[in-house]
From Swiss-Prot:
Gene name as annotated: CRRSP22
Lineage per the UniProt record: Eukaryota, Viridiplantae, Streptophyta, Embryophyta, Tracheophyta
GO cellular component: extracellular region
Keyword annotations of the record: Repeat, Secreted, Signal
Lineage: superkingdom: Eukaryota
Main location class: secreted
Organism whose genome encodes this protein: Arabidopsis thaliana (Mouse-ear cress)
Descriptive protein name: Putative cysteine-rich repeat secretory protein 22
Residues of the Gnk2-homologous domain: 44-146, 152-276
Length: 279
C-alpha cells in the first residue's frame, strides 16, 4: 500500500501504517496549500487494494461487469452527487459506489469519478475489491454489496503538521463542539426533509438525503472551519452512529493540530483554520 502520490500532491509525509485483518488505518501529516484549497480538484488522498476479496483476469466476465457499472454510474451522476450500481450474477457481480463531496456536483463529480477509476486500474489492476479517496470523491468497487451498511474496517486519518498556539485544550474542545454541531445539522429533519430515496441503476438508486454539513466557529482572532458527511446510502440514524464513531477518533488523530480529517467509506469529517470548502 503506497501513499507516495499523496505525498507529492498534498506535501504529505507518511508517518506510519498499521494493517491488520480487520483494520486498515493510515496516519499522515498534511501540509495543504491554504490559498488554493478551495480551488483544488481531484486531489488524491489514499487507496486500498482489498486482497481478501480476490482477483480477476483481463477480459473476464467480472471486468466486463465492472466496466458496465462504471459507465452506468457516470451516466447517472446527478446533483445529489451519489450513485450506487451493480451488474452481473455471482460470482462475477460487481458493486460500485460513488460519493462526491457535498459541494462537488455534476462536472466536478464526473471528473473525479474518471480520475479515480483510472487511478484504481493502475494501483489495483487485478483486485476485485478496491477503494480510493480523493478530496472531491470516494469510489468503492467490490464483489460484496455494502449498500446501507456502516464500514468500520477501512478508514484512515490525516492531520496538519502545525500545532495550534495558545490554549490547546480549549481549541480541541471547540473543534469537537463544531463537529458535533455539524453532525446535528447534517442529520436534521430540516436538512433532509423532502429528500426522498429514489430508485438506482438496476432498480434502486438511494441517497437523495443530504447527510452533509459545513460550518464555521469564531475563535477570537481566527475562524475554525468544519465539514461532516455520510454516504447517502446510510439512513439518518446510521449516519448519526457513523459520525459519532468517527468524531470520537479526534483525540487520536488530530489533538492540538491546526487541521485534520478522518475518512472511511461511510462517513468523514474535516476541520481547518482556513476555508477549504464553501460554508
Amino acid at each position: 500500500m503506497s501513499s507516495s502520490s499523496a505525498s507529492k500532491l498534498l506535501g504529505s509525509v507518511l508517518v506510519f501504517a498499521m494493517i491488520s485483518v480487520q483494520i486498515v488505518f493510515i496516519h499522515c501529516v498534511m501540509s495543504l496549500n491554504e490559498t488554493n484549497s478551495l480551488n483544488q480538484t481531484n486531489v488524491y488522498l489514499h487507496h486500498i487494494c482489498i486482497n481478501s476479496q480476490g482477483t480477476y483476469k483481463p477480459g473476464s466476465p467480472y471486468e466486463e461487469n465492472l466496466n458496465r457499472v462504471i459507465r452506468a454510474i457516470s451516466i447517472t451522476i446527478s446533483n445529489y452527487g451519489f450513485v450506487h450500481g451493480s451488474n452481473g450474477d455471482a460470482p462475477n457481480t460487481v458493486f460500485g459506489k460513488l460519493q462526491c463531496r457535498g459541494d462537488s456536483y455534476l462536472s466536478k463529480c464526473r471528473s473525479c469519478l474518471t480520475t479515480a477509476f483510472s487511478e484504481l486500474r493502475g494501483r489495483c489492476p487485478k483486485n476485485k475489491g478496491r477503494i480510493i479517496w480523493y478530496d472531491n470523491c470516494l469510489l468503492e468497487i467490490s464483489p460484496i454489496n455494502s449498500l446501507g451498511k456502516i464500514d468500520y474496517e477501512y478508514n484512515f486519518y490525516m492531520y496538519n503538521e502545525k500545532d495550534v498556539n495558545g490554549d490547546t485544550n480549549l481549541f480541541n474542545k471547540n473543534t469537537r463542539a463544531l463537529l458535533y454541531r455539524l453532525k446535528e445539522k447534517a442529520t436534521s429533519k430540516e436538512n433532509n426533509n423532502g429528500k426522498q430515496d429514489l430508485p438506482e441503476i438496476g432498480g434502486k438508486r438511494l441517497g437523495m438525503k443530504m447527510l452533509y454539513a459545513t460550518g464555521e466557529k469564531s475563535l477570537r482572532t481566527m475562524k475554525l472551519y468544519g465539514m461532516v458527511q455520510c454516504t447517502k446510502d446510510l439512513s439518518i440514524k446510521d449516519c448519526i452512529v457513523c459520525l459519532n464513531w468517527i468524531i470520537a477518533k479526534l483525540p487520536t488523530c488530530c489533538s492540538n493540530k491546526q487541521g485534520g480529517r478522518v475518512l472511511s467509506t461511510s462517513c468523514n469529517f474535516r476541520y481547518e483554520l482556513y476555508r477549504f470548502v464553501k460554508t
